[in-house]
Amino acid sequence: MSIRDSRTLGEWQDKTRVSPHIPYSLTHEDIFDNGGMANMANWDFTVMGERLANDERCAGPGLAAYFVKGVIDRDIPMHVGTCVEELVVDDGTVVGLRATRDGEDIYVKANRGVVIAVSSFERNVDYSRKLALQIEPRSMVMPSIKGAHLRLAGEAGAQIARVPDVSMLGFHIPGEEQEEGVPLWRGALPFMGLPHTIVVNHRGKRFANEAFYRSVYFGLDEIDGMTQSYKNFPCWIIMDRQGREKYPFGSVMPGDDFPDGVGVKAATLAELAAKIGVDAHGLAATVDTFNGYCETGEDRDFQRGTYPWGAMMCGDPKQKPNPNLGPVLKSPFYAVELHRMAGGGITSTGILIDEHCRAVGWDDKPIEGLYVAGNSAARLDNGALMQSGITNARGITHGYLAGRHAAGKPSGLLQQEVTRQSL
């Protein structure tokens, strides 16, 4: 990912968001060439400081700034503080929209169509419970992500589609907030697969490959038929003194004590189990087995550390023989309860689209003049290839396809792939 100097955005510099979740002043190469996420002490903080001072952005914020600059360079108007209230439909075709700004109605005519790209609905508690089956809706995303696409496109007759959503795990550090006082939730993804760390259920048992999020998140939805309860939730991340001294945990730096309200600490595993209500014998047996795997470098239960993704994203290249395996051995021990969250912007439920990213109506025909892109579109394009960055990739792809079709030059790339792969 290239670096974007956000000072070129002019008045839009402060209006273009940065992320509270990633070190956006470093590229992936900067991070992984210096020991990865697990070795913050090796990062080039001089470069980081210079880029922060110059507001040079990398990763997702850099990509966002790049697109904003593209809009500026093309003299395309942008408006903040403007809420789209409804689409204007004429004889089944979307021809414009009605918005409000400062309490006044604004009507915009669409010459070639309207594109809805307002992300998902994770900050809408009602939608998250009904559509994503979230028990206690929490999310990492910004507070404004409330599902406007479902309302707008739904009123125009668009279908809503879904496949089962994936739950994420996360935690909240008291005092960390987003705008409007909304609690800032952090994903546990970068920390679960670190050495000297495991994730266990109430029986004290591991239930997944902690270094690969798909393994963990699908394990969360397993039901115990005898008790009619979740087998692996609630769950806790367990670490020892080595893990706490070596690695960060959200905004808590290596070696720092957890703030009040974050986790518990105990001199022994038995004491830790008692404090969090986990089966002590189960936890002791799990840790003993796991520590044995750390000696051989082979996790015989869940193959942790065998996937390049896990080794790269939450592994420590200094840890031998397996970058994701380090024993949970040294006192004191720590436990932090992990909470279910929506998919970090990657919800499955959304507006059904066709190969040109047109919204599809309940008659299974495209709604002319209405396009949907990114997380506003139903995520039915799922599979093993879907890894980190998929939301950005989908948004870019949808925008390209919608733009080509609206311009009267529809792309045939998807149909070529369908033919090539005999789908």
PLM region descriptions:
Residues 1-39, 150-154, 159-282:
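An anion/pyrophosphate-binding glycine-rich loop and adjacent beta-alpha core
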Residues 54-61, 73, 101-178, 224, ...:
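Glycine-rich loop(s) and the adjacent beta-strand/alpha-helix scaffold that form part
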Residues 106-111, 254-256, 342-416:
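C-terminal structured subdomain/cap of oxidoreductase catalytic cores
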Residues 122-127, 246-249, 379-382:
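Short acidic/His/Gly/Ser-rich catalytic and metal-binding motifs that mark active-site loops
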Residues 142, 186-191, 213, 227, ...:
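Short Gly/Pro-enriched turn/cap motifs at secondary-structure boundaries
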Residues 150-159, 276-279, 284-287, 393-416:
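Internal hydrophobic alpha-helix adjacent to the cofactor/substrate pocket in enzyme cavities
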